[in-house]
Amino acid sequence: MSATIKHINIKGIEVPIIFEEQKDLPILNLQLVFQNSGYIQDKDKSGLVNLSSSILNEGTKELGSSNFAQILDENAITIHSSNGFETFVIEISSLKEQSKKAVSLLNDLLKSPNFTQSSLDKIKTIQTGYLKRKENDFDFIAQNQLKALLFKDTALENPSSGTIESISKIELKDIENFLSKTISLNNLIIVAGGNFTQKEIETLIKPILENLKIGEKSEVKKIDFKSQKSEKTLQRDTEQAYIYFGSSFNIDSKDEENYKAKVASFILGGSGFGSRLMEEIRVKRGLAYSAYGNISINKTHTYFSGYLQTKNETAKEAQELVSKLVDEFVENGVTQEELTAAKNFLLGSEPLRNETLAQRLNKAFTLYYRGLDQDYSKKELEKIQNLKLEDLNNYIKSHKEINNLTFSIVRR
């Protein structure tokens, strides 16, 4: 059974529910997804949203972290908050027989989060320790440096984890203000599945929804950026060179030709062995253990990025080869053999991407969130099946902006 999209009216607000019934799983899987509420909202307080999701994992003010966690464990219930760039998510999972208790506990949590200075100090200490450990994680450093270069002066410029300095300046009132603004009916999408009917789910979660305020509708804004051919190298005592690269890729998440980007991305660097980057950089020249590249399509932004590790002595050669390969890819496109192999994999592996309830719900949510029809994936596969070599290569050639590669390198 595939997911359905319906709405439940709460306080005059039509809240969407993405739901799939699966009778052979006696579980509840529930997500409250708040739009335009990820670390896109950090603004000048880098790490704010990350800390806000962490404090919701600290239990209620009355019970505290340990007692709340003990009750969850005793009843095999998970309540977890997290965030991406565009969304803030609160998730429940439990057995069906414990679903009412799980929802009741979430209701308690939302009514009275553990907004105490001791909780904030605790999660700040944990986050600061994490960031200190990351000071010697050169992948982490190179990746964050790429974001700072590629997305300069946008909400994507800063890491979601924040910095040691920015974390130290965040106060309890900042978190309270963010969560008060974020957790509202107007920005909510519900994703639910398990051994329930649609009516049972609505009845189960209604107490939570009735306690949420209406809030203001927050519109997602596109992030405009234009990559340039540039590079920045950090000198560190490392045995390898860490090379991250990225560029603009000017498409919209609702573009009807995105299936071509999917195929192009797979051939250039997304397919592992057999991809253009892996074949030329690792297999033919032995410059790296692995090399990847991928076109990432999001509601607010779309871009091409990739990475590789190589010896310090061959870093420049590997960097120049990446630029050359991307240039040639845009200029000459792909071969019929590459297109056929990509079609076979993408079409043949589709069933594996729909095996679990979580996979299907995630796909249904992504399509809804991007404003696409629920049969979009089926139509996309048909388009991939019928894609002609000339059409794909013309599409690739039209995206010359991918050549404007920005490099972030950490090496000795």
Regions from the PLM with identified roles:
Residues 1-28:
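N- or domain-start disorder-to-order transition segments that initiate the globular core
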Residues 22-38, 45-46, 217-274:
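His/Glu-based metal-binding/catalytic segments typifying zinc-dependent metallopeptidases
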Residues 111-118:
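Short, polar/flexible loop-turn hinges at active-site or ligand-entry regions and domain interfaces
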Residues 20, 25-54, 65-111, 141-165, ...:
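M16 family metallopeptidases and their MPP-like homologs
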Residues 94, 129-134, 224-236, 345-353:
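Short, conserved secondary-structure transition motifs
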Residues 6, 152-161, 165, 185-252:
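An aromatic/glycine/proline-enriched structural segment found at the starts
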Residues 388-398:
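Low-complexity, intrinsically disordered Gly/Pro/Thr-rich segments
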